[in-house]
Design a protein with these regions (language model features):
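Solvent-exposed, non-transmembrane regions of membrane-associated and secreted proteins
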Residues: 20-233
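N-terminal Sec-pathway targeting helices
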Residues: 1-16
Length: 233
């Protein structure tokens, strides 16, 4: 009797597991379909036009983020009166487990020294899942540039990749440098945590772009973070 009961439990477990796997696959496909039209438009339209068009769809759109030849090609949101709203909402403000990349509510596009963008780490490289590939230096060498369009398209060059406990290094608190020593201290700290060395050191006054996602393989408090400096001229 116990043997039969165990068999029933095993069958039920496998059935539930199969349902969960299928559901997860359907959800990822739904996520892909949700952004595919936007990504196709971004490839064919002028960069400023795609941002303007998306703003008409939702005034919370503040820019468009791309890392060429990766899966990262998404609108970026910001809602200062509800900072984490897009952690679990799509561009149309509908609930979404996967959310939409969003700029920290503490950041000002024009004034901040460091623009911090958050996104979920989704299996298959969706949303900011591709950021974890930067733990491999070979991947970095093939994808050194980040494009972020707001009023104009700006190019950023990656200078550090870290995987860190957010409580050990609260990088997310640095938005505006108090002075040059404060800026340099932050940059040195970032480079100290770098997984591998990159021969680029931002100078005071240069704008930083920070992309942050969960590093699921290390634990709930760990983040995989990519830092880049704006190229001017």
């Amino acid at each position: 009797m116990n043997s039969k009961r165990s068999c029933v439990y095993v069958v039920l477990f496998l059935f539930v597991a199969a349902i969960l796997v299928i559901s997860a696959g359907m959800a990822v496909n739904q996520l892909k379909e949700q952004f595919v039209d936007i990504q196709n438009e971004a490839q064919t339209m002028n960069d400023n036009n795609i941002v303007d068009k998306l703003r008409k769809r939702n005034k919370d759109v503040i820019g468009y983020l791309e890392i060429p030849d990766t899966t990262i090609s998404y609108p970026v949101m910001q809602k200062k009166d509800n900072p984490d709203f897009y952690l679990n909402h799509d561009i149309d403000k509908n609930y979404s487990f996967y959310g939409t990349p969003y700029l920290s509510a503490y950041c000002d596009l024009e004034k901040s020294d460091n623009l911090i963008i958050y996104g979920h780490n989704i299996n298959g490289g969706k949303m900011f899942g591709a950021l974890t590939q930067y733990r491999d230096e070979t991947f970095y060498k093939k994808h050194k540039d980040i494009l972020f369009t707001t009023k104009d398209k700006k190019k950023y060059k990656i200078f550090s990749v870290i995987s860190v406990n957010k409580n050990d290094f609260p990088y997310w608190k640095f938005v505006m440098a108090q002075d040059e020593p404060d800026y340099d201290t932050f940059i040195n700290k970032v480079r100290q945590y770098s997984i591998y060395d990159i021969d680029i050191t931002p100078k005071y006054g240069e704008k930083i772009l920070t992309l942050s996602t969960c590093d699921n393989r290390r634990g709930d408090d760990y983040r995989c973070v990519v830092f880049a400096v704006e190229l001017v001229g």
